[in-house]
């Protein structure tokens, strides 16, 4: 076991401006979220250059997502124990080096390995971005605005993936969807090394390696099973076995956590209403929102015959809407409370998804992409900030990194599960046909299903989310 130091805060020089700390944290979050989606428009070029088959193309996306989700809790706990700045630098360094390796890959396995290491680096980096930000900004309106900015930048990174990828592939090559991270990562690394102050929980507890291995293996195996559903179906052995194995590993994780003296995830956290309810709501919201970008891009290219760059440009208003929603949320939270803003955001998004489900083969841009896209993403931005605020408000300071990691894990795993289920629904409705009419029917059913998920999530928020952010509660 590795021992954590009990020093709570390293000596530092004059504190940097708060805006600079927020900017560095948000830059790290932007890179993490951007790489979830930026490779999508580059997949055909990757296939032609490296000889990837259909399964290989799937793993270009899944290798990152699985490693990201599977190692997230370990990254959050490591930040609490060994220092948020240190883990920020380690995670961003891994991410940047893996981006370089992926951009220079000459064989398919090299690209897939690089994507997995990117996901590992992102999992170490992402939890530290939020805890560094909340440590630098005093609690209250200023922190709510900072979290709103963090949420907006993260959402904007996901939204910008298609546009950035389209520009880079059209102007340069597929390799630059990865290589672009290298200069940006180097600049952020230098700024973080110079300006960020070190902080940690300082409780002297040891890193729970057995728990970390079990939860990472469980989430990774479960995510692998989910990724198999589109190709093999839900009842195939290739799907059922990893799903069962993943659930068994997660069960073993819970058993270990209930017995160890210094657990990776104190099970008492699950009894904190704010933490549990906000994370379940985040999982449901993520399962719908993640699918929006994927299926809107497919609809634009496969049905309306947009180029990758045109598809990215078509979604720019939606990208701006999610940023607007994230910036409006803190102001509305002061007037209405976090719970009602989260509910309102989910309902606005549900209206957009319902509208999008009326899409047609010859749909006009204004009514089939732009306006419903704006509503969907405005609602997403409004909901995400209060949910993140509620989740972190229920934790003790020494658990902040863990809860931050749990928020990101909930969103990512919800998105992975949602995408697998929605892809299966779309494929079943279109019966494997590539005709525009059949594809449109499949995509429409996906948006109707997502509408229902968001409405269920809104009801859950009304019944379960606390009216006000919780005071820090004991989690053990």
Feature map (PLM): residue ranges:
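A residue-level signal for alpha-helical anchor/packing sites in multi-pass solute transporters
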Residues: 132, 136, 167, 195, ...
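Structural signature of transmembrane alpha-helices in multi-pass secondary transporters
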Residues: 32, 61-64, 68, 95, ...
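Hydrophobic transmembrane-helix bundles of small-molecule transporters
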Residues: 148, 170-283, 288, 306-307, ...
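Intrinsic disorder in cytosolic terminal tails and internal cytosolic loops
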Residues: 1-17, 201, 464-476
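Cytoplasmic-side transmembrane-helix entry/capping segments in multi-pass membrane proteins
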Residues: 90, 142-154, 204-214, 239, ...
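12-transmembrane solute porter fold
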Residues: 18-41, 54, 237-249, 261-433, ...
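Transmembrane-helix bundle of Major Facilitator Superfamily
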Residues: 2-194, 328, 336, 347-350, ...
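Interfacial helix-cap and linker-helix signal at transmembrane-aqueous boundaries
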Residues: 46-47, 78-79, 164-172, 226, ...
